[in-house]
């Protein structure tokens, strides 16, 4: 992970070159878009960032009061490694969460003194997996369109992952999805 200072005075703009490595250490390092489409690494490992971006105390304070989409853009942009421009990414994020039933997307609700619950059920299928799946589907569609490619996704599940995936990928231009459910065991 490398940061470069912008030449403009009093303005720091980091250009980040993010690479992802396999947890098993036997697969080639990849950038964000390749990892997004690869899923698992060739060696069966998971791809993780080689290094994690750090936030200064000032940057953390600046997050206060942001909407969920604004917060997502601010925190996730470094992981893109410059492969998707920030304006496009912000649009994708806004579209991903526009269909949620609560303006806050995932509201933090106080239930008592020093007790809070993060509500993750306001997505289209009411499953917590909507939070990630809605963004994943749109990011994949964007990257596939940029590359002039299509993808077919096949999955099997006995829970709410399938419904969240089907809903997220429904109507996407570059993906088809097939989910298998065990008969009578969902």
Range-by-range predicted roles:
Residues 3, 17-186:
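PLP-dependent amino-acid enzyme catalytic core
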Residues 5-17:
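Short, Lys/Arg-enriched N-terminal segments with co-localized hydrophobic residues
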């Amino acid at each position: 992970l490398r940061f470069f200072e912008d030449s403009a005075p009093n303005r720091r703009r980091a250009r980040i070159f993010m690479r992802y490595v396999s947890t098993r250490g036997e697969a080639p390092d990849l950038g964000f878009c390749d990892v997004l489409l690869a899923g698992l690494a060739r060696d069966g490992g998971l791809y993780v960032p080689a290094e994690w971006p750090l936030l200064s105390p000032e940057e953390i304070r600046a997050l206060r009061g942001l909407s969920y989409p604004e917060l997502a853009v601010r925190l996730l942009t470094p992981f893109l490694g410059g492969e998707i421009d920030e304006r496009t990414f912000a649009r994708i994020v806004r579209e991903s969460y526009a269909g949620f039933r609560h303006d806050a997307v995932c509201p933090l609700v106080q239930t008592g003194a020093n007790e809070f619950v993060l509500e993750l059920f306001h997505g289209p299928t009411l499953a917590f997996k909507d939070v990630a799946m809605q963004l994943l589907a749109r990011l994949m569609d964007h990257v596939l369109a940029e590359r002039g490619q299509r993808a077919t996704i096949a999955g099997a599940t006995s829970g709410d992952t399938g419904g969240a995936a089907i809903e997220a990928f429904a109507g996407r231009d570059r993906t088809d999805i097939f989910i298998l459910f065990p008969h009578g065991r969902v």
